[in-house]
A protein has these predicted regions:
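Short N-terminal alpha-helical targeting/association segments
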Residues: 21, 44-46, 71
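Short, contiguous strand/loop micro-motifs
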Residues: 12-13, 23, 51-53
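N-terminal flexible/basic segments that precede or flank functional cores
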Residues: 1-20, 83-94
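DNA major-groove recognition helix of helix-turn-helix/homeodomain DNA-binding modules
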Residues: 63-79
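Conserved beta-strand edge residues that scaffold enzyme active sites
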Residues: 43, 82-83
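Recognition helix of helix-turn-helix/homeodomain-like DNA-binding domains
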Residues: 44-58
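Short basic helix-loop element that most often maps to the first helix and adjoining turn
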Residues: 23-42, 67
């Protein structure tokens, strides 16, 4: 895969909602100059699945998130929140 991992390292995005995670994945995909279809092929998924993930729609299996991240050269990192302030809009949840 032609992902430039060094270029990807300078972009760290913290997410707290499905919509934010989808937007982050879309941003990484765009930086890697990949289409949804090419990312789907690399991840062993359908293009429609990538679209749903990027839109934060429905429920997504954790294995799907890991497959997408692996195809983009990303890893999932858990850490304590930086603040207790909720930093998203209600429409990000519903």
């Amino acid at each position: 895969m032609a992902t430039n991992h060094k270029k990807q390292k300078d972009l760290i995005i913290a997410t707290r909602a499905a919509g934010q995670l989808g937007q982050a994945i879309e941003r990484y995909r765009a930086r890697a100059k990949l289409t949804q279809a090419s990312l789907a092929k690399s991840a062993g998924l359908r293009q429609a699945t990538i679209s749903k993930v990027e839109k934060g729609m429905g429920t997504t299996e954790i294995e799907t998130i890991y497959a997408v991240c692996a195809a983009l050269g990303l890893e999932v990192v858990l850490r304590p929140r930086q603040s207790e302030k909720v930093d998203f809009r209600p429409e990000d949840i519903f």
